[in-house]
Amino acid sequence: MSKFFRRRKFCKFTAEGVKEIDYKDLNTLRQYLTENGKIVPSRVTGTKSKYQRQLATAVKRSRFLALIPYTDNHDV
């Protein structure tokens, strides 16, 4: 018997019944980015592959339109 109980991951988008991920929904997109600006993998978040692909496309679109930065702020 193990000491730790690992909670089962679930896809938030499937649970909420989302059809498509919007690139303008910055609050949702930021939940799936690290503090450095990288996209968090689906094995960590539990997102299904269909929504992970949509998420990656939405993040890349919003980066291109300068809605979110490509990386964190650098001190040069």
From Swiss-Prot:
Record keywords: Ribonucleoprotein, Ribosomal protein, RNA-binding, rRNA-binding
Domain of life: Bacteria
Residues making up the signal peptide according to the UniProt record: none
SUPFAM superfamilies: Ribosomal protein S18
Transmembrane segments: none
Molecular function GO labels: small ribosomal subunit rRNA binding; structural constituent of ribosome
GO annotation, cellular component aspect: cytosolic small ribosomal subunit
Disulfide-bond pairs as recorded: none
Gene Ontology biological process terms from the UniProt entry: translation
InterPro entries: Ribosomal_bS18, Ribosomal_bS18_CS, Ribosomal_bS18_sf
Any Pfam family matching the protein: Ribosomal_S18
Family note: Belongs to the bacterial ribosomal protein bS18 family.
HAMAP family, sorted: Ribosomal_bS18
Subunit structure, interactors included: Part of the 30S ribosomal subunit. Forms a tight heterodimer with protein bS6.
Free-text function comment from the UniProt entry: Binds as a heterodimer with protein bS6 to the central domain of the 16S rRNA, where it helps stabilize the platform of the 30S subunit.
UniProt protein name: Small ribosomal subunit protein bS18
Annotated organism of origin: Xanthomonas oryzae pv. oryzae (strain KACC10331 / KXO85)
